[in-house]
């Protein structure tokens, strides 16, 4: 009888692990406690993966994790966790307050007689990338649109033509992070007339 060769039982290829990532802080849930958004991370995990939540955050799991610590270390860990949570809440409140106060200015500017451009400033406060928004404006209104630097140090989007009302509607419709109340329409021509009237009077 002929010998039949048996394949050698060598090392198999390593298998990939499936890792769950937190929807709030984007870390694996086991590491959420080191970030500043622990409470939000816990809520997210409880809604999306109850089994993992019970394994990490159940009272039994927490007690087992802190059992080896001394009383002083437990108190210190608790104090640190409260401090981190308070700091994260304060940062979030500050960011929300900043967004409330931020204003997007859509200004119609007269260049020559009956020729206008529309400038849009303040969108970067809402986390929008100006180059992408300028490209969207150009596509939507079939006109030239570019990001330019302002003398005060910031940047604005300049769109060819008088499209200020349409831009306001487009921003409200497409970019939900920008509240309609925070968009201000300004007509530069009227301002020039007012300045001329006050100078003459």
UniProtKB/Swiss-Prot annotation:
The keyword Cytoplasm applies. Keywords: Cytoplasm, Ribonucleoprotein, Ribosomal protein. InterPro entries: DENR/SUI1_TIF, DENR_C, DENR_eukaryotes, DENR_N, SUI1, SUI1_dom_sf. It comes from the Eukaryota. One of its GO terms (cellular component) is cytoplasm. GO terms for biological process: formation of translation preinitiation complex; nuclear-transcribed mRNA catabolic process, nonsense-mediated decay; ribosome disassembly; translation reinitiation. It holds the Pfam family SUI1. One of its GO terms (molecular function) is mRNA binding. Coiled coil: none annotated. It is found in: Cytoplasm. Residues 104-175 form the SUI1 domain. Interacts with the 40S ribosomal subunit. Belongs to the DENR family. The SUI1 domain may be involved in RNA binding. This is Translation machinery-associated protein 22. It comes from Pyricularia oryzae (strain 70-15 / ATCC MYA-4617 / FGSC 8958). The gene is TMA22.
